């Protein structure tokens, strides 16, 4: 996830990615570059296409390569979803939130980026990793238990679900829902 975002931002090759994920990360890079909706094993979009067309730079972001890279990276971090109901994806979010929570200087950088956006554009539609980090801290959860114990993970998932139910405003009618209902993003779009 982060290797793809970093490569999109810098224009450099992917940083080392574990062998099990290398091909998947390379495929994500190709999909983003093509900017055509397609299936994504990485995001679990195997029955419906993921909207890679969102990654096509537009407006002033087309002025130069640097702005195009910035646009694609920001879209990646804003739209690349983790599904609350998918254990693998949810555990990855929990790990991200724990790392963020354990590093106050990184949490401050994250807040310094997100707070002006929230002020100017409003609160996010999906749950943010920051909110998951706050719940981890308040609930005094042990990361190892969340990674290995399904009952603990399910209890925590219910707490995140409360946020999702109150906050997520953009949802398709359940009859037409093609992807997961509740998504978590590093930097959710508004």
Each language-model region and where it sits:
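Long, non-catalytic protein-protein interaction scaffolds
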Residues: 1-190
């Amino acid at each position: 996830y982060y290797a793809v975002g970093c490569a999109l931002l810098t224009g450099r090759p992917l940083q080392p990615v574990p062998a099990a994920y290398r091909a998947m990360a390379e495929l994500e890079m190709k999909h983003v570059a093509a900017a055509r909706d397609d299936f994504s094993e990485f995001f679990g979009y195997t029955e419906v296409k993921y909207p890679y067309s969102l990654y096509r730079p537009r407006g002033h972001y087309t002025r130069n390569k640097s702005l195009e890279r910035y646009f694609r990276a920001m879209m990646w971090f804003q739209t690349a979803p983790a599904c609350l109901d998918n254990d693998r994806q949810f555990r990855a979010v929990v790990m991200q939130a724990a790392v963020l929570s354990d590093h106050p200087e990184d949490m401050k950088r994250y807040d310094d980026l997100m707070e002006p956006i929230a002020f100017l554009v409003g609160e996010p539609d999906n749950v943010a990793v920051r909110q998951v980090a706050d719940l981890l801290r308040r609930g005094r959860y042990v990361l190892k238990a969340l990674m290995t114990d399904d009952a603990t993970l399910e209890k925590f998932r219910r707490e995140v679900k409360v946020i999702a139910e109150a906050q997520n405003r953009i949802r398709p009618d359940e009859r037409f829902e093609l992807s997961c209902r509740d998504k978590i993003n590093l930097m959710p779009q508004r």
